Amino acid sequence: STPIKSSAASDVYKRQGLKEEEDVTIQNHQDAVEMLLKVLIEKKIVHCLEEISGVGHRILHCGEFYHDSVLMTEESIKKIESVNDLGPLHNPANLMGVRAFMKALPKVPNVGVFDTSFHLTMEKEAYMYAVPYEWYQKYGVRKYGFHGTSHKYVSYEAAKHLNKPLESLRLITCHMGNGVSLAAVKYGKCVDTTMGLTPLDGVPMGTRSGTIDPAVVDFICRKENKTAEEVNRILNKESGYIGFYKKSSDARDLRKAQAEGNELADLILKMQEKKVVDYIGSYYAYMGGVDAIIFTAGIGEKAPETRYNICARLKEPFGIEIDEEKNQIKGQFLELSKPDAKIKVLVVPTNEELMIARDVMRIGNIK
């Protein structure tokens, strides 16, 4: 096996707001896990390995197998391996980590938490593509959606804040970071989401195009003499923010450039906001109303301009108004809507690690 050199690997741990990082050279995932466990003891995070009650693994894709997080066994690993072609960059590495922990801590429950499973409650009318049906039967071509752990977490937290059962609420969750996806959550279940077979679909993002006419791929292949694979890479890595404002894919840099009069930075930000509003309107109609709109992730939590601009576009159709002073606060749990608002607007900082930990406790039956 090829050693993972220091430039590509770093040992990072966080505890109670503290963060330490050091470059290391390791041979493989097993070495990485052994080193991590050693560090946990050295830093007195645990006194011995017996104190570790469970391990949670963020895994990208479970195909259509698991509507919930699952205890990792040889059987569940084999099922996930069978859909590796749906997540070729992430799934194999995710499973190497699972196997390494199962070997290092054989008596401890390992729980797989999937980015896609929260969205498996969608109806066929929402997740199917109008392409030859056999593509779905043979290859699983359909909408899967991503960021599921985040959408699930903020839905639970919003219900808690509103002091209502999640099963009684219609929510639109807006996960807006370098990757962006929205989900329509009706009575506790996802009924639609913006990302598709891959995370490329939906809203324009930091480096991704979002939804485009699929014929663009063939058109550019012929015009630029490129392969479909090359164009796919450009749509994933060189589009969105970076496709317009060539200097950065960071929303903060684009806001600064916009303020300085950069027309393309201004345009792509407005395109993104419009697309978010389009989806919110669509989900409102599909769910027959909405009780709360939730912003989360880097942009959702820390970009007041984005929140304001989206809500301003929703004022006329839905009567949404937010407290502009409160909206200037970044990175905190906020209720931005007026007290008597029919549709609440919340900022809920996401915490995927906590959601994973909760699932480990629940699925692993840890008291």
Where would I find each of the regions flagged by the language model?
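Internal helix-turn-beta structural module
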Residues: 266, 270-286, 291, 300-366
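Phosphate/pyrophosphate-binding loops at sites that engage ATP/ADP/AMP, CoA/4′-phosphopantetheine
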Residues: 39-53, 158-165, 280-291
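Glycine-rich phosphate-binding loop of actin/hexokinase-like ATP-binding domains
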Residues: 118-223
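Adenine-nucleotide phosphate-binding core of ATP-dependent small-molecule kinases
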Residues: 233, 240-244, 251-286
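Short beta-strand-loop/turn "lid" adjacent to the catalytic site in phosphate-handling enzymes
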Residues: 40-90, 109-111, 117-126
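Single conserved hydrophobic/aromatic residue that forms the stacking wall/gate
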Residues: 2-9, 13
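Catalytic phosphate/nucleotide-handling subdomain of diverse soluble enzymes
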Residues: 186, 192-224, 233, 297-328
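Glycine-rich beta-strand-to-loop/alpha-helix junction loops that act as flexible
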Residues: 57-60, 176-178, 290, 294-302
